[in-house]
Amino acid sequence: MNRLRHLLALPLLALGLALSGTAGAAGPAADHVPHTAKPPFPQITLPEHAAHGQRAIDLLGSRLPEVANFYGKSADEFKGLLLRDRTHRLDKRGRLFIVEEMDKPLAATTATASTPGLLDGSLQPLDQTFLLHSRPGAKRTIYLNFKGATLTGTAWNSSGASLTALPFDLDGLPYSFNTTELQRIQYIWQRVAEDYAPFDVDVTTEAVPLDLINRSSSTDDVFGTTVLITNSTGVYSCSCGGVAYLGVFDDTSDFYKPALVFYNQLGAGNEKYVAEAISHEAGHNMGLSHDGTATANYYSGQGSGTTGWAPIMGVGYYQALVQWSKGEYTGANNLQDDYAVMQSYGLPLRTDDHGNTAATATLLTGSASGGISTL
C-alpha cells in the first residue's frame, strides 16, 4: 500500500471507530493551532559562519537566551539542539540553517511509478509540467523551482557574489527539458503535494508572482516559500542533499529563502529521493528540526516493504510510507508535533470536510442487493 492509500484509509478507519463508540478519548491527529507572532530577532554579529555544537553555544554567549526565545525554545532546549545535531549551524547573524550532510552522494537508482510506495497517479500533459498547482487560490504557496535561478542578495550569497543555480537536468542539457525530465518533475510534484495535502497551501511548479511568496509585513497573510531544485556545483560547497534556514516561512523578508535541494547528490535526480528532500527542506523553513535518536541525527524508519515507515524530518528515502511525526517511535529525540509547529509558523490546516465526533461526522449511506451491502 502506498502513502496515498494509507492516507485515504486512515480517515475512514477513524470515522468508523468514532461512529462505533470505540475510538476512545483521543482527539483529532492535528488540532488547529494559531499562527504565532515571533519576537524580533536580536541584532548579533558573530565572527564566523556555520558554527555548530559547543562552538556555536560559545559564540552566542550571553545572547543565547534571546536567540533561543526567537525559536520558541528555552536556553537549555536550544543548547541541547545544537549539541545533539551538528547539521544545525549558525550564520554570522546568529540565524540557524541546516546542512543535510552525507558521507557521499546517494547512488543513482531507477525509480518508476510502479515501485512499491511510489505514487501511481496519472500525469498531466507534459506541456503543463510547469503549470501544476495542488490548491490554486490558497493564501500560502510552496513554489518548486526546477528551472534554475540567479541568487543575489540572499543569505546564500555570503561571499557577496551572485550564484548561478542551474535547472534540474538529467541529460546534460540544463536549459531544455526532455520527456524523462518533464515526467520526473511531475512525479516529484505529486509526492510533495501529497505530503502537504492536509494544509491550506498551493504546491506549484509555476513561477508565481513574488507577492505570493514574499511577505511584505506582519499583517500580510499571503506568503510562502520557494524550494530551488538545482545542482550543488557553484552554489554550495558540501557533500549534502540540501540546505535551508530554520523557521523563516513567515519572515517579512525573503533574505533567508529559498531552500535548496541538490538533485545531483540524490541518486542523480531520483524521483523519491528528491521529493523527500523537498518536503524535508520546506519543513525546516516552517520551523521543524530533525527527527533522530540518541545515536543518529536522522531516524531512517522501521519495517520494510509496503509497511515500512519513516518520518519526513528523518530520512524518508528508503521507506514506502513517510509522514509528518511527533516522535512516535522508540528512542525519538525530537517530540515536536510537526502539524502544530508548521501551523504556528503560518501554514494553516485545510478546513476538515467531515467532523471528528459522532454528532458532526458524515453519515455513511449504502445500499443492499441480493444480501450484499455496499457503502
Spans of model-derived segments:
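Active-site-proximal segment of zinc-dependent metalloprotease catalytic domains
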Residues: 136-142, 147, 154-155, 159-296
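Bacterial N-terminal signal peptides
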Residues: 9-20
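Bacterial N-terminal signal peptides that target proteins for export
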Residues: 1-11
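Primarily auto-inhibitory N-terminal propeptides
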Residues: 25-170
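Post-HExxH zinc-binding segment in Zn-dependent metallohydrolases
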Residues: 303-334, 339
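Non-catalytic extracellular/lumenal accessory regions of secreted precursors
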Residues: 330-375
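Ordered, small/hydrophobic-rich secondary-structure cores
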Residues: 30-51, 272-304
